[in-house]
């Protein structure tokens, strides 16, 4: 990156990002993040408005001070990712599966593959997809896509709940490293590691979803009709439905509960 402003172009589209999240974005591991936060007397959990990052002079100063280290980490990860894709024989037509929404993952992967002259044609399969950038590969949304986005608003009303159906029970990938001659993903700390109740809920949700898929695998009913009850559950939940998600919280920045606890809770 030639500047601080340019370095921010791949930051997540979330409204807020924590200082720790920004340092992770720049490639610093947990111990490094703690050290940097202490050096600059900042809290790792302190949130920043993503839209205002480019004009934050304090963060720009920190970036300028760490710039060379960030560039070195970026080069190392770029090479490791390339080796990882080659190691896993990523050539020709490749399908990717994600929950979807704006198509950012497919866009950035396409950009990376093109920059390294890799002959790969991506096809994305999503719950719902309406890209906000031009994609070269194909996309298919089971509930909505560019050809039919009637259900988009209703689906996004329940985005947090739907994302739990795809929630891994391990940390997300934030880098790669070489281990015993192979390139392996480096996983972040699992966001619900200290919440066994939530882990149990996620497992039950996913088991139920898989059972539903198995039962309806050969069903001729349209995808949107099959998902009708799930969509309605998200748009017009009963109080009982809402309480199913009372233990859940959002970890993008400050911890926020999915639902407001009632006085008796």
Predicted region positions:
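Amphipathic alpha-helical surface "interface" segments used
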Residues: 227-234
């Amino acid at each position: 990156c030639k500047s601080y402003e340019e370095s921010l172009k791949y930051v997540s589209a979330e409204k807020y990002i924590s200082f720790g999240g920004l340092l992770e974005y720049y490639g610093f591991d947990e111990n490094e993040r703690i050290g940097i936060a202490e050096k600059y007397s900042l809290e790792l959990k302190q949130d920043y408005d993503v839209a205002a990052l480019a004009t934050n002079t304090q963060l720009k100063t920190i970036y300028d001070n760490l710039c060379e280290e960030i560039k070195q980490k970026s080069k190392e990860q770029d090479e490791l990712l390339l080796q990882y894709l080659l190691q896993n024989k990523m050539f020709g037509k490749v399908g990717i599966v994600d929950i979807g929404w704006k198509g950012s993952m497919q866009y950035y992967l396409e950009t990376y593959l093109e920059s390294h002259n890799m002959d790969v044609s991506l096809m994305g399969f999503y719950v719902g997809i309406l890209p906000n950038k031009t994609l070269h590969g194909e996309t298919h949304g089971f509930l909505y896509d560019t050809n039919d986005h009637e259900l988009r608003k209703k689906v996004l009303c329940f985005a947090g709940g739907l994302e739990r159906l795809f929630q891994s029970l391990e940390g997300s990938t934030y880098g790669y490293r070489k281990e015993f001659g192979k390139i392996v993903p480096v996983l972040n700390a699992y966001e619900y590691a200290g919440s066994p109740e939530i882990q149990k809920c996620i497992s039950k949700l996913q088991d139920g979803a898989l059972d539903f898929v198995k039962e309806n695998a050969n069903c001729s009913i349209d995808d949107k009709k099959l998902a009708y009850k799930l969509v309605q559950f998200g748009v017009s939940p009963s109080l009982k439905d809402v309480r199913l998600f009372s233990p859940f919280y959002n970890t993008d920045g400050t911890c926020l509960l999915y639902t407001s606890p009632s006085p008796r809770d």
